[in-house]
């Protein structure tokens, strides 16, 4: 895609580099602007914002390479594209797939141009220190049209007579680094959204929380292997499968209130429920003699009388 033909004179290479850097300046900063707008406008949910903040804190080597990431995202999005589904995760993931594909190639081309310009830079030229280069956080505060002039002013402050080829190389270095950082942020967002389509947003949030806990735990106190999202979803899948297989053969527990057991006592060889029968008087308890008729009863004389 990228073919660079260097001119034999430093002036020709400088002209070619100036044209390349100025023409690509707008394209370079588009991913940066898109990610800033995304964070401030497109995602206002509190729980999702916390989960995304956790995604930003994960190590860089946790995420797949850009080529593998885009391929996996397309595989996850293909059923939704065919069904023309309009969902939040589908729309945003599709946006980042297109953005990463386009500007990853642009970033690679700029890196190749910067490497080719090294051949025409005077060997005695000292590279511009990091303190004179625009950082990612500073680029968010600088207007887009002032980005080139701001970096040029910093180069002049470092060395007023800095060679023009070295200046172009410095500009390309800065823009490539800014683009790579913006693409890394977009890569993490793409990973989040297409995994939410595969596993569900709640499951991915739970997985990220467990993974961060595992990473923050000292090595001697944590498990040998990091948690996986498959292990989190496996118990749910097994439970659902078990219910489908045993349906109709066993009554599930906990769906109906249990009946209270009725206490019974033995009365003359038969069982009598206390809850169903009325409470008998003290003189008619089980096992007591029948009461005598007091009307016909004559009182025995007292021995004192």
From Swiss-Prot:
Keywords on record: Host-virus interaction, Secreted, Signal, Viral immunoevasion
Signal peptide boundaries: 1-19
Complex formation: Homodimerizes.
UniProt lineage: Viruses, Riboviria, Pararnavirae, Artverviricota, Revtraviricetes
UniProt similarity note: Belongs to the avihepadnavirus precore antigen family.
Biased composition (Basic residues): 248-279
Organism field: Heron hepatitis B virus
Molecular function, one GO term: structural molecule activity
Primary location group: secreted
InterPro entries, A to Z: Hepatitis_core, Viral_capsid_core_dom_sf_HBV
Propeptide: 273-305
This protein's name: External core antigen
Gene: C
Segments of this protein annotated with the region Disordered: 226-305
Subcellular localization, as worded in the UniProt entry: Secreted
